[in-house]
Curated annotation (Swiss-Prot):
Gene label: OPG066
GO cellular component, one term: host cell cytoplasm
InterPro entries, sorted: RNA_pol_30_chordopoxvir-type, RNA_pol_30_chordopoxvir-type_N, Znf_TFIIS
Protein species of origin: Monkeypox virus
Molecular function, one GO term: DNA-directed RNA polymerase activity
Zinc finger (TFIIS-type): 155-195
Descriptive protein name: DNA-directed RNA polymerase 30 kDa polypeptide
Keywords on record: DNA-directed RNA polymerase, Early protein, Host cytoplasm, Metal-binding, Nucleotidyltransferase, Transcription, Transferase, Virion, Zinc, Zinc-finger
SUPFAM superfamilies referenced in this protein's UniProt entry, alphabetically: Zinc beta-ribbon
Amino acid sequence: MENVYISSYSSNEQISMAVVTTDIRELLSQYVDDANLENLIEWAMEKSSKYYIKNIGNTKSNIEETKFESKNNIGIEYSKDSKNKLSYRNKPSIATHLEYKTLCDMIKGTSGTEKEFLRYLLFGIKCIKKGVEYNIDKIKDVSYNDYFNVLDEKYNTPCPNCKSRNTTPMMIQTRAADEPPLVRHACRDCKQHFKPPKFRAFRNLNVTTQSIHENKEITEILPDNNPSPPESPEPASPIDDGLIRATFDRNDEPPEDDE
C-alpha cells in the first residue's frame, strides 16, 4: 500500500491519501504511457484537494435521488452543493466499462479525498484515451472579438450630452415579430439615455429605368427626452363604428329615427 501525500490549501494540515492498491503507478501504467503518468497524478492530486467539498455528511436529510441515467457515472455517486449543504446521489448500479473495472472498484471502496483523487484519475485516463486535453487550465478559450467586437468603446454610439462612447444599447420594449423593438442607448458616464441614430433615405423613382436610388446618411443623434411609450390603444368598438346596431328589450321604447 502506497501513501500519497498532497498539500491541502489549509496552511496547517496535510491530507494523507492511502490508495488501496499495491502501486498506483503500476495500475495507471496499464492505461497511459510513462510520459503522461506523472503529470496525470500531479494534476489529480491538485484538483482533488482543491475542489473536494468537506463538512457535508451524506445523511437521509440532505440526499436527493436524481432522475437521470447513471450508466456512465460509476464512481460519481454524490454531486455536492456547498452552498445549500446538500448532496445529490446517483445510483452506480452499472459498471462504466470492464476496461476500468479495477479502478472503478477502488473508487467504490474508498471515500473522502481518496475517492476524489481516483475519480480525477479515471477522468484523465479517459481523456488521454480519446486524445483530448484533461486539464481545463490548459484549454484556451476561443476569442470572437474579431467577429463580434461589440464591447469595444470605440465602436459604441457617442452620447450627445457628454460625447462619451461609454454607452450601452438596451432593448426597452419588444413588439411583434414583424415590428422593430424599442431600443435606447444609456450612457454610463452622465447617466442619460438617448435614441439610437437612424438612416434617412431619399428615394428617387425613375419610371423609365425602374431603378431606385437611395442616399442614406446618419441623422443627428438626439437625446431621448420623451416619456415612455404608451400602451397599445384599445381596439375600436363595433357599436361605435356603426357595424353592429344596439339591441333593445321589447319593453323599452323604440329608438327615434334620425332625421
